[in-house]
């Protein structure tokens, strides 16, 4: 008999330790940390020497939050393969034990998930924080950087869903956790990158068109 609540039930997790914190406690800490980052970035954006638009400020928040999630949350998971054994109540271990109720591939160390998260931790996370700097300073490469990052996030999320569906989509303990974690939280990494891709595409296209018009007038 399985000693864990995850699906599939025949998943073997030796010495599994259930969550020591309540679900509300885990979400409260997560929410508080996210709010502090959002508030801090909003304040810093307001003090920028440039007159940043609200959209730019929200983009700074997105890249800061997602970058820190990649580096800290996903970094912990990547380098802590036996987090499910944790008996100390470690916050990050508790977060992942809870999330695995919606996608047990994080407990079983599914190769597709390890690959996706490895790229996110090592490349996308640091580059996302660099995007915050690029927006704040109005760097010319800001839109190209954001487009590249959003494409990687969108591609990684697409693989995340497709690999689950191709293998039977049977990694959630129940429908509630399936929709709350796998669909809703996972879908966030499709929705926001898609919107950023569209915006950056329009900005870059407009800039190229402007340059073409200048060249046409010059010649």
Swiss-Prot record:
Residues that span the membrane, as ranges: 26-46, 59-79, 112-132, 144-164, 178-198
Subcellular location: Membrane
Pfam families hit by this protein: EBP
Broad class of where this protein is predominantly found: membrane
Residue ranges annotated for the EXPERA domain, each copy included: 55-197
Gene Ontology cellular component terms for the protein in this record: endoplasmic reticulum; membrane
Keywords: Isomerase, Lipid biosynthesis, Lipid metabolism, Membrane, Steroid biosynthesis, Steroid metabolism, Sterol biosynthesis, Sterol metabolism, Transmembrane, Transmembrane helix
One Gene Ontology term from the biological process aspect of the record: sterol biosynthetic process
One Gene Ontology term of the molecular function aspect: steroid Delta-isomerase activity
EC numbers on record: 5.3.3.-
Bilayer topology term: Multi-pass membrane protein
Catalytic activity reported: 7,8-epoxymelianol = protoglabretal
Pathway it works in: Secondary metabolite biosynthesis; terpenoid biosynthesis
Function as written in the Swiss-Prot or TrEMBL entry: Isomerase involved in the biosynthesis of glabretanes triterpene natural products such as glabretal, a component with in vitro antiproliferative properties on lymphocytes. Catalyzes the conversion of 7,8-epoxymelianol to protoglabretal via skeletal rearrangements.
Entry's family note: Belongs to the EBP family.
Name recorded for this polypeptide: Protoglabretal synthase ISM2
